[in-house]
Structures are given as structure tokens and as C-alpha cells.
Amino acid sequence: MKPLAIPANHGVMGQQEKHSLPADFTKLHLTDSLHPQVTHVSSSHSGCSITSDSGSSSLSDIYQATESEAGDMDLSGLPETAVDSEDDDDEEDIERASDPLMSRDIVRDCLEKDPIDRTDDDIEQLLEFMHQLPAFANMTMSVRRELCAVMVFAVVERAGTIVLNDGEELDSWSVILNGSVEVTYPDGKAEILCMGNSFGVSPTMDKEYMKGVMRTKVDDCQFVCIAQQDYCRILNQVEKNMQKVEEEGEIVMVKEHRELDRTGTRKGHIVIKGTSERLTMHLVEEHSVVDPTFIEDFLLTYRTFLCSPMEVGKKLLEWFNDPSLRDKVTRVVLLWVNNHFNDFEGDPAMTRFLEEFENNLEREKMGGHLRLLNIACAAKAKRRLMTLTKPAREAPLPFILLGGSEKGFGIFVDSVDSASKATEAGLKRGDQILEVNGQNFENIQLSKAMEILRNNTHLSITVKTNLFVFKELLTRLSEEKRNGAPHLPKIGDIKKASRYSIPDLAVDVEQVIGLEKVNKKSKANTVGGRNKLKKILDKTRISILPQKPYNDIGIGQSQDDSIVGLRQTKHIPTALPVSGTLSSSNPDLLQSHHRILDFSATPDLPDQVLRVFKADQQSRYIMISKDTTAKEVVVQAIREFAVTATPDQYSLCEVSVTPEGVIKQRRLPDQLSKLADRIQLSGRYYLKNNMETETLCSDEDAQELLRESQISLLQLSTVEVATQLSMRNFELFRNIEPTEYIDDLFKLKSKTSCANLKTFEEVINQETFWVASEILRETNQLKRMKIIKHFIKIALHCRECKNFNSMFAIISGLNLAPVARLRTTWEKLPNKYEKLFQDLQDLFDPSRNMAKYRNVLNSQNLQPPIIPLFPVIKKDLTFLHEGNDSKVDGLVNFEKLRMIAKEIRHVGRMASVNMDPALMFRTRKKKWRSLGSLSQGSTNATVLDVAQTGGHKKRVRRSSFLNAKKLYEDAQMARKVKQYLSNLELEMDEESLQTLSLQCEPATNTLPKNPTDKKPVKSETSPVAPRAGLQPKAQPQPQPPQPPHKLNQGLQVPAVSLYPSRKKVPVKDLPPFGINSPQALKKILSLSEEGSLERHRRPAEDTISNTSSQLSSPPTSPQSSPRKGYTLAPSGTVDNFSDSGHSEISSRSSIVSNSSFDSLPVSLPDERRQRPSVSIVETSLASGRLERRPAVEPDQYSLGSCAPLSESRGLYAAATVISSPSTEELSQDQGDRASLDAADSGRGSWTSCSSGSHDNIQTIQHQRSWETLPFGHTHFDYPGDAAGLWASSSHMDQIMFPDHSAKYSRQSQSRESLDQAQSRASWASSTGYWGEDSEGDTGTIKRRGGKDVSLDADSSSMTAVTAEEAKPAAMAAHIAVTPSAAKGLIARKEGRYREPPPTPPGYVGIPITDFPEAHPHPARKPPDYTVALQRSRMLARPAEPPAPGSARPAPRPQWHRPGDGDPRAGPCAPPGLTAEEDEDEQVSAV
């Protein structure tokens, strides 16, 4: 890192962007723009270090929904169903919603400790947090660890505080953890450093001096500082720790010496980088205790630097011939097969490699290893479906079969004709046939199997490679030939042995093997099989698997969590108890990060129910298991119906009714199984007498069946919908191969083309639009409300299933603009569901890199199965990839690959569960009160009960205590849900959804007619009509039409924070950072102590500060500014913004929003004393008009300044800057938790917070009003209309207001060139503070302590200072809002306000700037003709430009003194100012 003393390159900021993300990374969703903005991670989880641009999209925050006074509504008009009765609601205790979803901010606790008091765990916490920041990029883990051990924490509380003066001696190297600072150079250039950037000394003891003046730009800037001496020592020590391996004078590998703790027991060398050949060779070298996962990491990531896996395969075969390397080579191959069997399947060269390796093992008499290899192949092989056709039934089969249930085996292929179609289809020796034409072949006699295969000309065959069992079968057959007697298998009925218990290691293998029972009485044989397998494992384990190097790592994790210097546990304990002799720290054969078990073999316990009818329409409920055949059902049905005939006279028939009303009837084959899964809703099973031709189902019954098959969402159980969603999502999630993440991340071509990953990726969009489609297609308002309520319940149950993906999708769907604008529908939602919804949203608060969600995900009691939020996974991986170079000094950067592999392993563990997926998410009829806090795992879920016992739970036959009819009804509900989900018709076009939304609730007029008119305002052209506070009086004022070339103008919006300061010692009384100050480095230490003391006294003072600093979100969110090289693209029209008397601002950015553009409002606290303020209303052609509207009289104004405002969350950077805020009313009890509180914010955008962006657009957060408020505190005494005002998106236009006229002149400033340093490609960075610097003699009325300070009104023009004119003391500032289409009028409502959704990170939108200004964007539509006509009548009269006034810097008043009230305490009119005087004031907006 270069020091600040060198102006050309300041820390990381000097690095130019290398490459922006490929657009297809963000295919998940459409938002308003493509932003190549750099986002930096600030959570304690994601593990990324970023130095280049990422394209993950912005996401509006999930704000807090407020309650309205309207209580629960009367639902009597809507018939209640059993699913959604109010009684049910009372049973389901929703009061748990008050349980907050917060935990202590562990990272801050660690930072505030004295460095000498930090434990190893503290350093691990800090390391995981810090190593994602760009300042630490390309540092080795040991250097980061050392820096974390000595860093001190400092907080500068006030914006505008001088941190370093020009020429001051530097004494430390510092990294910004929160907030941003601005460096103003003597030549007038300015640069903004944001979260993750560094400044200060270089790693040398030479004296260095600050160049320029550094000031904080926002309140509550947080830094960590490392003293110069420590910084120099640590960085210079790196070379000493490096060990370079040279060959022929060239460096081929670099290792680093690491100590993982202070005990000195865990230390050694770890590979940092190397050539591909040398890394391959390292596979069979000795690995130190600090690098135990090298083989795994290599086998996952070799594809990024090697062209073909055979490069590794050939080397392994070659090394196998060396007896000293043989065991190591075998272990590598076993791990490869176990972890990435997909590298072998479908690749002929790799299949031949595997066969050759097997032959080598046989040749060397390594039988135990060979068995383990076969076990691994059987465990990892996937089912394959192939179709064969025979020319005639008599035609011979092209293959020979062995096995059969009479021998205790399945059906296996012994040989295949080489020239047959079966070979072309992929059938090969050793394949086990699992199913033919829907009939189960896993437990069938060989003769019966041959009969089925011969009697069909069209064969649909499901097979799976199972070499281990096939070889066991061959051994048995040879023994039989020798001994002359059939040999009963020792490995018996595994299904009955261990299905409902957590098996030990041997039984795991047993389940994998899939051996079948000989007959129904062979349960006792299991023990012999288990013992035999244990012997197999015992023989081979020691020679293959290394001994456990240390004992303090949990079973559920690989050693890599500790090795690379990250935390030792990811808090995902595994449910697999491992036998004591197996190294639990190695992800070896039976502990893959993905599933090991094959769940195709299910229990024989009768846990399913069929309803079987007779021709006279009597019915009985029959308990069956999944493998019960049709013939067995007939036997049971005859017994239930008390029929005296023999089973041979009857058969099972399926009768179904098509949607057209056609009745179909077919006889089921005797061997057909999975009967409960096959029956349709519009079908029934009948017991049919084979000798009669009676009609089984009459027309009346058929019509009834057809009616029953028509399903609506409200008829479905919310628990069952959540369960089925979770089962479906989990199946998709666990099918993702680890290699797919790598292929997708590095854009590698693979034979599977990441199909599983893409499928799972699409789910979140489909579920989001499902929610919107379902709600908007319902025309009845009461039913619409009930559907919303239904979805909130489903989301809650998804949380219980740990299905965060669906939970997030449902919340996002409810917040899509077309749904969010349905004000009257939302008003009818009961308050308790408001609170529930708010609680669910709170989990996905994007601040601090989604700290709340990550805390829940990593909590101790959250165990697999977990379905994580996929966009966050993808973002984390992308940042690791984009933020670290793949090659360093010509060598493969293996440190980067190790971090990526560790992240993928962590994700994979969420899917590693040793349980049938069908049982995982079963939480039938669980009361909500038992769900616990949202921040806790559901310890009463079935899988967790089993997992936590670590042993065998007592099995209970469910049929002994569960009513068959009740079971059937539950199963029928599951069938209904499955059919409903499979037949969904989604409306994925947001324009169509908007049309449906307007049909549900048409847009209303934008302007109320009088002050008492409380009619909610909606924009006819806005897709979002937010629910906000009451609509105050608005007086239209004329505005001249804007010329077409002015369409790219933005709003000038001042920003003010409602966040309470941590005032203890006035920061300005403290000396600057550097040596020149009396206290030198002590200054920052005193800041640190001040912040620390503050925390202990804070709870008594204010709740916001308490919640924010001690809980999961830090005091301020990561805010940042874009890199050099970007400019703002022009946008079409100007958004309006308006402030309401007691409304709070929230950005309303929908997930998909080519039509959902909103406007940028001023944010004010909830108070009733009002004063005039400015509202600018957009028009269709960017002609605006000013409204005068009674607004709150605050001590501080809050401003909708895009990213700076913590709540102004819809900020999009770079290509197009789109802000979509809106207003919401705060209820009194929520005032203290107001979202402008910086603690939980940083919500400029999803990525700015979720990824800790340091390139997020941010300018002013938590400024004092004088620093940020050019209007709202600038007044003139003109009783007439105020003129409109606009500013360009890059620079301020000159806007001047004379004393008694509404005339104005504006002059557009030309943009600075891209290569100018001060123009950091964004309006956020090329600005200073307009309000504070331009306030000279401008005729503004300044208030201090309630007194008006009048200046000369004649000179009341405010001139913008361009960046060229800006000086360190007078830096021009503005906040330009590049609006979207003419679609964003702020609307208001009485009562509650629903917040918009988070747009998931990684979603890209249609970039508006892809189209020239002259042509309309295809995704935008003009306002309705009537609206345009109405607005055209509001055009202003022409104005003459007055003489420009000069802008001079003015002293910056200290608005908040220690005696001032809390900024959140609500605005009050200054003493002595009456309400009448208030009303008479005119506000000039500049």
C-alpha cells in the first residue's frame, strides 16, 4: 500500500478497476441498472477480499413496516377455511414476533478490547472480518493475523472533523471500517476514501508527511490503526516467513510459515503460490499440520489452471509405480472419486483411468483399498435413465443379468453386447437396474425381472453403477459353485435395520451399498453385514487416512477453517457421529461435504396411506410403505373389505378423470410400487374383480373428483406449502456439484454446463413472481388480503424449515412494486401480520454485509439441512474471485483457490444430512409458539432431534398410534400442494403485473384539493404507490418547461442524519492523528476509549445507539464512493421528492424494476409542528414545479440523498443512478428504531451493505443541517411562488433566486473529464458540502438556538461552486439524483406503509444508459395523456436571470451542541416562533 503522502495512489483507491463482472452473473433478476460498482464486504462471514469491480446489483433495504391505527379487520365476508381460521391464528401464537432478531456485535467487542487482552478466538473473529477488506488484499493470512493482533479501534463521531492536516507527520497505517473521509489537496483536487480503504505510512520507518487535509464526511467514522513501528515490523517480517522453492534458477513454489495459535503447537509451512506442475507434485508430498486440505482444495480447483484432468491422472498412475508414493496416490484417487465423481462419469478418458487404477490395485493385492474405491464409486454414482427399444417381444435382450432377491441382491448387468444399442445408451457391466417402466427392480426375483424385460418392446430403464455390490455378488456365485450350496448373504435387510436412526459409520456404508433383503425375515442378518464392513474399513483406514493432527476441530468441519487463519468453526455441526478411529478432521470417504447416502432406499415401515374404493363407492384406508406393491395392496384391501375371494381374482385399478371430463381406467401391474406417490388428485384406486366388467366410477363421482382437483392457494395448508417448497429447493440445492460453483465462477466450459446451479438460481425468481402473480390475479380485495396473510405464514414456516431462499423470495414478492402499491389491501392486513412481516424482513437487513442473516446462519443451533440465500453465496464467491488475482508473479495464486474451496465446502455442509429428504422438513401441526425466536434454530425439527442425540433413537411404528384417515388427509394435502406447485402459471413480466395491479386498485389523483383532504395520493404513472403518511396541503407553483437537452438534470437534495451522536468528548477538541499533535497516536486511542466508555453509558441515553452498536449491525453501514473512471449517464426525467408532515423516508426499489421507479423524498422525523418546506414534483418532460407544503420543523433536516442517507437505499451507481425512495409513517413506538439510524443502515444499496461496498455511491450521511442543507434553511421573504430548481447529475447548475421574484437562471456546468482525479466518476465523490461552504452572504436565514440570523436579502442568490473552483476550505457539494422514468411520484396513505423488498445481490437490471438520450428506453413508458395534459397546465412563466451572486465560504455553525436534544427526538419550532409566523415563511430551495 502506498501512503497518503504520495498523491498518485492512496491505498487501495489508487488501483484502477481491472474487470467488471460479466453480466450473466446477475441473471437472477432485473433491476433498474447495471452497476459496475465495487462493493466491499464487511460482515464477519463472507471471507472475501476485493480489489476489483463486482457487478452484483443494488438492493433496496427491507425496512420496517409500521402499524396503522386500524386494527384487525372484519373478515366475515370471506368464508373461512379450515386452513386459515381465526381459531388457528389464536392457536398459532404469533406473539413471538416481538422477539428481536439481534445478537451482539462480536467484531466490535473484539475491536474494543485492548490488543494485549485479545484471545486467539478474538483474533480469528477479527481476521475473518478484516480479510475481506480491500486494504488487506493480497496480504498473506499470517500478515493479516499479526495486524489484527495489534490494531486499535477509533471512532470519529462528527462529520467535518479534521483527521489529518496538510504537512502533518504520519505515525500509523489506518483502515476505514465505517463511513468515509475526504482528502482535499492543495491544488484543489479531492479524493474520497471509503470503507475498506487504507491511508497512512508505508512499511518503512522513514518519516512521511500528510499531503492534503483529511476530513470525515459522515458521522461515526470508524478506523483501525496500526502504529508505524508495528506495521513496518509485520510487513517486513513477511519475507522472513517465506520459503521459496527454486528449480533451475526459477521460483516454482512459494510457501509461508504460519502459526495458527500462540501455543506454538500448530505451525508449519503452507503453499501460497506455485506453478501448475509443482502444485500437482505437491499432492504426494508431505503436508504440514497447517495445510491438511491441500489435496481437497487442489482436486476442486485444478480445473482453473489445468486444461485436462488427465494431466493429473497420468502423473498419479506414474507415481503409483513408486512403492513409497503408492499409499499417497491411492488416497488422492479415493478423495477424488469421493468428492468429485462427476469428473469421471461421462468422461471416457477418466473412466479408463479409473479402470486402470483398479487393475493396479488388484495387481498390487491392495484389496482393502480397492473395496474402498468401489464403495466410493457406488456411493457417488448417480442414477441414469436410458431408453431401449426391441423390434419384437421375442427379440433377445442385448445384455445378461445376475442377482435377484432370491440371492439377496438386486438385478445387475453381467455383460452387454458390444455392438448393441444398450452399449450406445451407456449400459455397462456392473450397473444395477433400479427400475424398468416404473416397476421397482431393487427387490425382485431374477425370473420375474427377465419376464418384464422380455414382455415389453419399449424399455425405460433406470440404472446406477454399483461395482462394490456387483463384485460381492460375483464372489458369492463363485463360492456357491465351489461349495455347492446357496450362500445366504451376510449383509441383509438394511432398510429395516437403520432407517429411523442415525447410523454409525459402518451402517452409512451399508446404506450406500444398497444391498437387498433375502426375505421378510432376514432382519437379524444386518449385524453380520455391519461387522464385515467395519472390518473392511478397519483394514484400510489406517493406511489411507492420515491420523488426526489435533483434537479441537468439530466433526462438521474440515481443518481448513483453522488452517487458513479463519475461524475454527462455521457452526454447522454435522449430524454424523464418526467412529473414534476415523480422523474427524479430514473430509475423507464417508464425510464428504455433500451427501454420501443414497436415499432411494426408504423404510419398510408403513408410513403412507392409500384410500381404496370398491365399485359400490365404499372405501378403506390401507397403510403401506413406499415399496409396497400393487399385489400386496390387493391382499390388504381384500382383508379390509372382508371379501372372501382369493387375491388372484382381484386387481388394483386406477381411475382418473381428465380436465375435459373423460374417465380413464387402467389396471396396475402387480409389481408397481410407490403407489401413494403415483395417484393424481383427480384419480382413485379401485379394487376390481377381474371376472366382472362393472363401472367403477360413475359420472357424478367423476365430476366430484374433478371438483376436488381444482385447487386454490387459500385451500392449502401453509405448513405443507412451506414443507414442499423446502423439499423441492433442498433437492435442487444438494444436487449442485461443488465443481459447478467453480465452473460458473471462472466461466469454464463443462459437460454439465452448471445445469443444477442454474436451476437452483432460477428458483428465487420463480417464487418471487409466483407471490406477485397469485396476489394480483385475485380480484376480491378481502381474498387478496388473505393471500398476503397466507404468504406471510408460508414465509414463517420456511424460516422454520431453514429455507432462507424461499423465505427471501416470498418477502421479495410481497414487496414487488405492483404488490406494494395495493394500499387498501395492505390496510386490511391484521396488525399482528404487519409485525410478523416486519420481523421476517428484518432478518435480511442488508447492513454490515447482511450481518443478521449471517449470524443466524452460523448460529450454533442451526444444523443441516439448510437452504441458504443463494444470491449471498454467489456474491461471496464472486468477491473472492474478483478481489484476488488468479496469478501472482506468474505463479498460480493457490491462497485464493484455497479460500474459494473453503467457501464452497462451507456451503456444501449445509446440504450434508444423513436423512431421507422426505422426512427432513416435516413439522406437521407445529404451533408457532414452539417455533422459537427467528434467530434460533428449530431444535424440535425431526432431523435435529435425531442429529442431536448422536445415537439411535427408539423406533416407533407410526401406524400404532397415528390414525390412518388423518395420515391420508395429510398426504392428500401434500398431493394438493405438489399439484398446485407443478401447475403454477407465473406472470414474469412486470409490465403485465403493473397492469393487473392497476386493475385491482386504480391509481388516484396526485394532488389533494385542500389541507384537510386526507385522500391518499398515488401517481398514475408510478408503478409504486407507497403507503406513507398523511398528505399535507400542496400548492402548485408554476415552473417553466425545461429544454430537452436538460433532461439529464438531477435534484439537489440535502442530507441530515437522525442518528444520535455518541457525544462524550467533542471530537474537535481532540488533536489530529499525526505526530504534530501533543498526544500523537494517543488521539486515536482516546477516540477509541471515548467510544468504549460511550457504549457503557449509552443504554440510558438512547435506544437506537444501543441497538445499533451492541447488536448485529454496526453503528454505521459501510458507505463508499465509486472508483475513478465512471461518470453518470444522463437520465430521462427528473424525479420529484416531497416531504410529509410526519413521514419517514424509505427508498422503494423493487427487485425487478424496469417499471418501478420511485422518487427521492426528504426524510423528516415524526412530529406535528410544521413549517413550510419544498417539494418538487416531476412532470412528464422534466418540467417540475415547486410545491409549498407544511413540513416538519426539525432541528435537523434529513434528506433523501441517495446512498448517504442510511434509509435512502435505492442507490444505483455508475451506469445509471436511480433512487427510488418514498415515505412511510413512523408510529410513536418505532421512532426510536427509525431506519435513518445509521446503526442498521448503510442501506444505500443492497450491495453496498451486503457486500460492504467501498465503491457505493455515498456522500453525506448524518450531517448536521448546516453542512448539508442548502434549502430547507435558506429562506427569502417572497410571498409568491418559489421557483423550481435542478442540478446536473455531475455538477451543480447555477441557480439564483432574487428577492421578490420567482425568476431564476440556470447555467449547466460542463462535466469534468474522466481522467481528472477529483472527478471520481460520480456525483458522490466530485463534491464537497454545498450547504456549508456556499452559505456566505446569500440572504439565507440561519437559525442558531432558535434565533433567526438574517443576512442581506439582496444578495440572496446561491451560486454553485464547480469542482474546478473548489478549494480545500470551500469544496462544492451536492447530491445529484439521476431519476428514472417519469414514474416515481411519491404517494401517501393513512396508516401503515409496506416497505419494498431487498433486491438480492447479484441481480442485474436493464441499464437505462444503454440507449441514447434521443430514444426512449424500451422498458419505459410515458405517462397517461390526461396526466401529461394536467401537468402541462402547471408550466411556469418565463423568468429573467438575475445577476449572479458570489458564493463565499461561510463558517460552519455547530448545530448540535452537547446541550442540544437528540436529533431523533423530533423537530421543534424554535422558541418564539409561532405557528402563524411559521406558515408565513417562504422557503427557497437551492
From Swiss-Prot:
Domain N-terminal Ras-GEF: 267-380
Matches recorded under SUPFAM superfamilies: cAMP-binding domain-like (SSF51206), PDZ domain-like (SSF50156), Ras GEF (SSF48366), Ubiquitin-like (SSF54236)
InterPro entries registered for this protein in UniProt: cNMP-bd_dom, cNMP-bd_dom_sf, PDZ, PDZ_sf, RA_dom, Ras-like_Gua-exchang_fac_N, Ras_GEF_dom_sf, RASGEF_cat_dom
GO annotation, cellular component aspect: apical plasma membrane; cell-cell junction; cytoplasm; endocytic vesicle; late endosome; neuron projection; neuronal cell body; perinuclear region of cytoplasm
Single GO molecular function: guanyl-nucleotide exchange factor activity
Subcellular location: Cytoplasm; Cytoplasm, Perinuclear region; Cell membrane; Late endosome
Compositional bias annotation for Low complexity: 1105-1122, 1138-1159
Chain positions with Phosphoserine modification: S501, S806, S930, S933, S1022, S1077, S1086, S1092, S1113, S1117, S1156, S1173
Binding site for a nucleoside 3',5'-cyclic phosphate: 135-252
Residue span, PDZ domain: 385-468
Domain Ras-GEF positions: 717-944
Region of interest: Disordered: 40-59, 68-101, 1002-1049, 1090-1176, 1221-1254, 1303-1357, 1391-1486
Comp. bias regions, Polar residues: 1244-1254, 1304-1328
Sequence ranges assigned to domain Ras-associating in this UniProt record: 606-692
Keyword Phosphoprotein carried by entry: yes
UniProt main location, coarse: cytoplasm
Listed GO biological process terms: adenylate cyclase-activating adrenergic receptor signaling pathway; adenylate cyclase-modulating G protein-coupled receptor signaling pathway; blood vessel development; brain-derived neurotrophic factor receptor signaling pathway; cellular response to cAMP; cellular response to cGMP; cellular response to nerve growth factor stimulus; establishment of endothelial barrier
Acidic residues: compositionally biased ranges: 83-94, 1475-1486
CDD domains, per database record: CAP_ED (cd00038), PDZ_RapGEF2_RapGEF6-like (cd06755), RA_PDZ-GEF1 (cd01785), RasGEF (cd00155), REM (cd06224)
Entry's free-text remark on domains: The Ras-associating domain is necessary for the Rap guanine nucleotide exchange activity. The N-terminal regionis necessary for cAMP-binding. The PDZ domain is necessary for its targeting to the cell membrane.
Function according to Swiss-Prot or TrEMBL: Functions as a guanine nucleotide exchange factor (GEF), which activates Rap and Ras family of small GTPases by exchanging bound GDP for free GTP in a cAMP-dependent manner. Serves as a link between cell surface receptors and Rap/Ras GTPases in intracellular signaling cascades. Also acts as an effector for Rap1 by direct association with Rap1-GTP thereby leading to the amplification of Rap1-mediated signaling. Shows weak activity on HRAS. It is controversial whether RAPGEF2 binds cAMP and cGMP or not.
UniProt record similarity statement: Belongs to the RAPGEF2 family.
PANTHER family tied to this protein: CYTOSKELETON-ASSOCIATED PROTEIN 4, RAP GUANINE NUCLEOTIDE EXCHANGE FACTOR 2
Protein name stated in the entry: Rap guanine nucleotide exchange factor 2
